[in-house]
Each structure stands twice: as C-alpha cells, then as structure tokens.
Amino acid sequence: MAAILPTFSIKSSSCTYSSSKRSLSSPKAVSLSSSVNGTPKVQSLRLSTSFVCSPNQIIKLKSVSPSRSTQLRRAVGGLEIKMMSVDAGIGVMGTKLGMMSFFEEDGTVVPVTVIGFKEGNIVTQVKTESTDGYNAVQVGYERLRDRKLTMPERGHLNKAGVIPMRHLQEFRLVSVDDFTPSQKLLFEELFKEGDMVDISGTTIGKGFQGGIKRHNFKRGLMTHGSKSHRALGSIGAGTTPGHVYKGKKMPGRMGGTKTKIRKLKIMKIDTDLRVVMIKGAVPGKPGNLLRLAPAKIVGKNIPKN
C-alpha cells in the first residue's frame, strides 16, 4: 500500500512560507496545519529568529518537523534555510595579473600575487531590510558595451545611473547607511598596507583526473609483479554493505570550483599603476575575477560567540 504523505501549510501574521524563495520572516511562533487522509490537524511550530523575509513572500516546504526549533530543513538534497553570513566590511573586485617576488626592507623575499583593477567597482544598488529583507551593497565591475547586456540588466544599471558592467556582486553588511548608488569604491581608501583580506575566486580547471593527482594518493609498485600502478585499489567491502559509500575519493573532475583564501596580507598598494600586491597565492590563473573583502577575524570584527 502506498504511503500517504501529509501536506503542510505555514502561515503567520507577516508571512507565508515556501521553499521557492530563499528568505523567511522571523515570528517566534506560528501555527502549522496539516492533513492526513483528509483529517485536519493543527500543531504549533517555533521558528528561529534568524530567518528574514519581506511581507507577502511565499516559501513552500516539502515537510516540516514541529520538533525542529532552529532551522527549517528539507530532505537530503533539498534546500536548507539559514541566516546568510555577513561580511566584515565592504570590498571590491579585481583581476589577477600574475605572481612575482617582493623584497621587504630586511631583504626577505616574499611571493606575492599582483591584482589589478579595471574600470568599475561602483555601487549599483543598496539593499535594506525594509525593501529587501536584508542589508547589502551591490557592486559592479569591468565595463563593457551596452549590446552585451540584456534589456533587464541594462535597465537595472541605468536606474542606478552607472556605466554598463559585466560583473555584479553583493557584500552583505550590518549597516548600509554610508553607501549610495553610483558611489565609487577605491581599494586604497578601503584598505591599507598590512591589512588582512579574504579573497574569493574560481580555481584553475584541471578536467577529469585520477586519484593520484586529484586526492594525492600514493601509487602502487611499478615492479615485483604489480598489476596496479595508478589504480585506486579497494573502494569498499563486498556483500556488506554491497555498495560504494557516498563521498568516496575517486577519479573525477578537478578544479573549476569557487574557493576562498582567508587572511592574506596586503604587502604593497601602488596607486599609480592601480595594482595591489597580496602575500601568497590566490585562486585562478591570470585574468581571473577575484573578490576582495576585509578578513573575518574573530574577536576583532566578528563576535566570539
């Protein structure tokens, strides 16, 4: 006999919830109505106050457990709704130019990445809790021709009174009172030499790779009768469990993923060349888009709890 799943609807005085959107309102308690075989049942559901939502938004949920008090979560592979991380401060976007050696005053040689800035880093939109449900500043980067944009994209930028730009990214902040549309953001005004930054970017794509290159596996013997040189070896037991566990390290596509390198030191800011030198390596190859933001340091700009 096929199982009959209950249907749920969640309503409060300020919002109705559904998974088609990514935000929720923050009532401390709402009522949960469900029906099984046509029999209505009403239960109370307590929600975390970390959820945010604008009025009249609808968020569909596949199923809700009344006992979960901190998060609303769907089944495996579904959407998990939680509070988005807030940046430590406003940042900018840049372009990776390459790497070089930097000599400090005492003669120490430091490997640095040179990051340049194309035309852009202009505020295109300021989002507030009253209008969008959260505080954020949208920044545009890298000018391009009008015909490269769609009409909605062009209208969005024209509304802010800015030039056509290729990339748009948001910096979620606690307060956005100091920012206005069409405001120019300069790296030398936001950061100084010695500051720590978090840099995000897309890693270099390597294509399909084996276990040795992708996961640093050790290869097998090349002599002594060995028939497996670069093979994985055992990937699990036999009849029990009778399948390969999820997450097993195996050959597959390597690289081409978004990553973040934290707490990199700014070694030099050259305003004449419009470049900045960052200690260490950053994701991607020369020409890659990078996102630079103040480093999150617990106890300094991020609360310990």
Swiss-Prot record:
Localization annotation: Plastid, Chloroplast
Example GO molecular function: rRNA binding
Organelle targeting peptide span: 1-84
Top-level division of the source organism's lineage: Eukaryota
Stretch list, region Disordered: 228-256
A GO biological-process term: translation
GO cellular component: chloroplast envelope; ribonucleoprotein complex; ribosome
Function according to Swiss-Prot or TrEMBL: Component of the chloroplast ribosome (chloro-ribosome), a dedicated translation machinery responsible for the synthesis of chloroplast genome-encoded proteins, including proteins of the transcription and translation machinery and components of the photosynthetic apparatus.
Quaternary organization: Component of the chloroplast large ribosomal subunit (LSU). Mature 70S chloroplast ribosomes of higher plants consist of a small (30S) and a large (50S) subunit. The 30S small subunit contains 1 molecule of ribosomal RNA (16S rRNA) and 24 different proteins. The 50S large subunit contains 3 rRNA molecules (23S, 5S and 4.5S rRNA) and 33 different proteins.
Name listed for the protein in its UniProt record: Large ribosomal subunit protein uL3c
Gene source species: Spinacia oleracea
Encoding gene (name): RPL3
